[in-house]
Amino acid sequence: MPASGKRRYASALRSRSAEATKTRILDAAKELFTNQGIDGVTIARIAETAGVAAATVYALFKSKEGILRALMRASLFGQKFQDALAKLEGVTDPVGAIALTAHVARAIYESESAELGLIRGASAFSPALRNMEQEFETTRFEMQEQRVAHLFAKAKQREGLRLDEARRILWMYTSRDIYRMLVHEGGWTPDRYQQWLSEILVRALVNDEAGREWASSLD
């Protein structure tokens, strides 16, 4: 094997090893945070459970807040979310994209269900973690902008609705609290939540004619 090929191979091995180490640390942290509470867990304890040196944890995540940030990102924007987003990117009809946003929301919250209490508890105790949660909400708000703008560009929005209002309505209906109240506390299945949300988003944001066209396309 040429020297350049050996270097690439060695680099790939190091990358896989680093990812495996990160996964072990995050798995250990999630288990400890869930069982012992966030405040009661130290970096040293996480390192011991993961089978690595504390210096390795600091090198990869900098702090306990960094670990929590990584856990939240994996929970909110993990593989289910990526799969839903890929499906959404193939939709050219703006009404269909608005309706399919329900699938994206479900993917986010269904993935994070195991960590829902952990994340909400963390946000309740630490201003830094509340700020972190707000960052994720801001990201979610920004990611929805193109879908709403496309709806307006095709003049399929509900009459009298402004773009900024439509963005806020979409953001509100797809919030974690709505999912929590309906699924976790209300006993709805994720399927029922997704169907309801899809229909409510179209009714709230789309004009009647475009809404009827979308509904007929489902028959």
Where do the model's predicted regions map?
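Short loop-to-helix capping motifs
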Residues: 63, 112, 125-126, 176
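Helix-turn-helix
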Residues: 24, 28, 32-66, 70
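N-terminal intrinsically disordered/low-complexity leader segments
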Residues: 1-20, 213-219
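Short, basic, alpha-helical segments at the C-terminal edge of helix-turn-helix-like DNA-binding modules
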Residues: 43, 72-79
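Hydrophobic alpha-helical connector segments
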Residues: 70, 83-110, 167
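Hydrophobic/aromatic-rich alpha-helical bundle segments in the mid-to-C-terminal region
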Residues: 152-200, 208-219
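Amphipathic alpha-helical packing segments from all-alpha helical-bundle domains
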Residues: 103, 107-120, 128-155, 164-168, ...
